[in-house]
Structures are given as structure tokens and as C-alpha cells.
Amino acid sequence: MTALPTDFLYSEEHEWVNTSAVVEGETVRVGITHIAAEALGDIVFVELPEVGSEVEAGEAFGEVESTKSVSDIYAPVSGEVVAVNEALEDNAGLINEDPYGEGWLYEVKVTEAGELMEAEAYQAANE
């Protein structure tokens, strides 16, 4: 079983940001948790936002498709997308293999934090 990184923050919709304190103007990396990845099953495709586009906390920005279903992915913070993980185009399964590392989705320059929780609270909400 994959452990939640304790220095990340999490959304109720199972996304993470790679910081313990979201600061306006800071760039953070975003992904989905192992809990979401395990629930989805084998991920075969992911739709990511365009670089330069704006995402809004709590709003859907793309989809993840698995052998079981298609699900929306929600932005945990608002801001401008500055990079996307192009490796996912050829191997969306990286999300299953390494959700907190090589399976990241995009990087965003934060304009506003969404409602995020620490690892302990996220874990408790998903037991």
C-alpha cells in the first residue's frame, strides 16, 4: 500500500498539491492520490489542461479514463497552468505506478488556494 506524503495537502476530490502551505504566486505540482488511482483501476488516458490556461479550485479541468470508468479531475487550487506532465500522453499508467512522483498531472502558479486538508485529515476522511 502506498503511503500518503505527509508534506502534501489534499482535496476532498482526491487531488494533491506538493506543498504543506499554499502561497499565492508560488508554483505547485498537482496530481491524484493513490486512493483515487486504486478506485479507478488501470488508468489508460488522462485529459490535462493546456499550458497557459486558468484552472479554478473545485472546478473540473480534465478527465481520467480507466478500464472501469471515466471520471472528472478537479483543481485543488486556482491559477495558471505552467506545465503539464507530457509523459502521461504515452503512459497514463504512471498515475497508478507512482501517483506522488512520476504520475503528477500539471504545475500551476497559484492565485488562490482551494479547501485543502493535511494528510492525516484526508486519510481519516477516506477510511
Swiss-Prot record:
Belongs to the GcvH family. One of its GO terms (cellular component) is cytosol. NCBIfam families: gcvH, PRK01202.1. It comes from Corynebacterium jeikeium (strain K411). SUPFAM superfamilies: Single hybrid motif. PROSITE patterns: BIOTINYL_LIPOYL, LIPOYL. GO terms for biological process: glycine decarboxylation via glycine cleavage system. Its cofactor is (R)-lipoate. The glycine cleavage system is composed of four proteins: P, T, L and H. The modification N6-lipoyllysine is found at residue 68. This is Glycine cleavage system H protein. The keyword 4Fe-4S does not apply. The glycine cleavage system catalyzes the degradation of glycine. The H protein shuttles the methylamine group of glycine from the P protein to the T protein. Residues 27-109 form the Lipoyl-binding domain.
